[in-house]
Amino acid sequence: MDLARSSIKLFIANIFGAGLQFLGITFFARELGASQMGVFFLFQALLGIVAIPADFGLRGAVEKRISEGIQPGEYLSSAIILKLIPISLIILSIVVFEQRINGYLGGDFAVYLALAIILQETAQLAVSVLKGELRVGETAELNIIRRITWVGGGFLLVSSGLDAEALIYSLLAGMVVTLAWGLSKISTSLKKPSFKNARSLFNYSKYSVVSSIGGYFYSWMDVAIIGIFLTQSHVGAYETAWRVTAITMLFSQAVASTIFPQVSQWSSKNEQQQIESVISNSITPSMLLVIPAFFGILVFSDEIMGIVFGSEFTIASYVLIILAGEKILQSVHVIIGRSLQALNQPGLAARATVISVVLNLILNVILILSFGIVGAAVATALSFAVNTVLHAHYLSSFVSIKFQYSQIGWCTVSSLIMAGVLFGFKTLVGVNSLIQLFIGIFFGMLVYTTITLLYQPIRETAFKNLIRLVPI
């Protein structure tokens, strides 16, 4: 598998999908307002939380075992049987607590939550199989199709007069399309399941689920707690800020998704030197976009939240800055965390995750009650910093982690210069409209890219990967 080419292919697809999703969220936020957006985000948060026991880490286990190339069909069949048990229990629980769930969400959406968990788990299992088959690049089109369905369907339904339910209906439609497309793509055939394969999956998933808990807690626990203590408008503003900063992680996530199956394969062959090389060479590209994004958001946070989404979203301007800074840590964590799991060390990843999850939960309750949604952002950043340090410590016990400090430093200097230029643009020209904001962002990107490419090692790596992307 060509790591650079797969990463860039996935990144390009993610850019398109994220751009489409950003336009969708912008339209929905302007049409529905922060409160209705909050209802939808709470639905997604609850879906993310119930997905933890519904999956129990099996998707990660399937990707790991299939990537090893031994009895993939048997592992897939065993995984399907294992997943039926927790999914059935989750659906039963949703039925029992339907009224309470509807009250929390602010509408009669519990039945759609049950349907969503079924569709999501089956669709994501198909995606995990593709990744395990070392066909990560092919998952790019699945993400695009899912987002096109959500945005397109949501646009039509919102335009017809529906509120938050429009976004939920289109979300379900996107899952259906992803499932159908994914099933048509995978080449692994179902074989007779076995207790041995099921036990192997469980032995991996019992640790992988803890890392999954960390991921879901990181993505949704702050939103869920905000929904308990604050208003749906706060939920809508906070999660919108989160979605903006998530765009900066697109390339980092593409790189991390690509290296996992490859590192897993090398690990099974004890090719440590290649593993160390790919980890070192992946960290800098992973940070390439998040560093300038933080400095750009530092200058334009009020304008992004107010001009793009509306004045009621400006309550999350400081949240936007804090979460953008946190993404710098996440860009390192996604590489280190996925590498640790690929080395078949889910237990250590689980240990780090448990510590950070407990810290995240405690800090969120304390800081949200004290500082509102800004406290939620601080809690997330602090707990994730601890998580990253612990993962790095555990990974360093098996392989050498080398940071390319000169390249990272050059990106930081380039970002500082860009921020100075943007501040001058904001002061002299002013940013009072979408056009002015987009011009400022484009100008900042141009300045950063130009200065960054002046550094020869970065320039040579960028051009080499660009050439590898183009088929000959």
UniProtKB/Swiss-Prot annotation:
CDD domains: MATE_Wzx_like (cd13128). It comes from Haloferax volcanii (strain ATCC 29605 / DSM 3757 / JCM 8879 / NBRC 14742 / NCIMB 2012 / VKM B-1768 / DS2). Keywords: Cell membrane, Membrane, Transmembrane, Transmembrane helix. The chain crosses the membrane at residues 8-28, 38-58, 77-97, 109-129, 164-184, 209-229, 244-264, 289-309, 315-335, 354-374, 375-395, 408-428, 434-454. It is found in: Cell membrane. Belongs to the AglR/Agl15 family. Disruption phenotype: Impaired formation of the tetrasaccharide present at 'Asn-532' of S-layer glycoprotein Csg. The complete tetrasaccharide is formed but does not make it to the S-layer glycoprotein Csg. No effect on 'Asn-47' and 'Asn-117' glycosylation of S-layer glycoprotein Csg. GO terms for cellular component: plasma membrane. This is Probable low-salt glycan biosynthesis flippase Agl15.
